[in-house]
């Protein structure tokens, strides 16, 4: 499965963890990163998230973001197709960086564009994103765990018990 994390998702572990939603999303993002490190997920990125963290005044956040982005198996270069799609997304109400993120993920044919931004989640679900789904990190981890459980169940039910 290919995943594109936007900057909001990558930075979630540094947000105020006193809110349950933020804490859950942070844990989910860290789990996604762990799955990428294990080779169970492929991380796609683009030039856009490489620009945004550089603008962050907090060095710890910058280092973390660049470390996550370094795990990407594919870096999507912005081209005229991505810019055109981003303009269309902008016309639908997405902010410029959000439109570039989503456009890059769609053009790269990522399975999932993961974000914690409510506005982007809402607009992304209302927008034509072809095969790319737009879930929260928590939803993504639930889907992965559910799929893993189903696969484990199928594997165990097809294994015949040995007769001794």
Language-model segments: residues:
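Helix-adjacent hinge/juxtasegments
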Residues: 62-87
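Alpha-helix capping/helix-boundary segments
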Residues: 9, 49, 82, 100-101, ...
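Short beta-strand scaffold positions
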Residues: 77, 96-99, 115
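Short, basic, glycine/proline-bearing loop/turn elements
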Residues: 14-18, 81-90
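Acidic, PIN/NYN-like endoribonuclease modules and their adjacent C-terminal/linker elements
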Residues: 2, 17-26, 91-92, 106-164
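PIN/NYN-family metal-dependent endoribonuclease catalytic core
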Residues: 3-57, 70, 74-75, 138-142
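Short, aromatic/basic amphipathic alpha-helical patches
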Residues: 59-67, 123-129
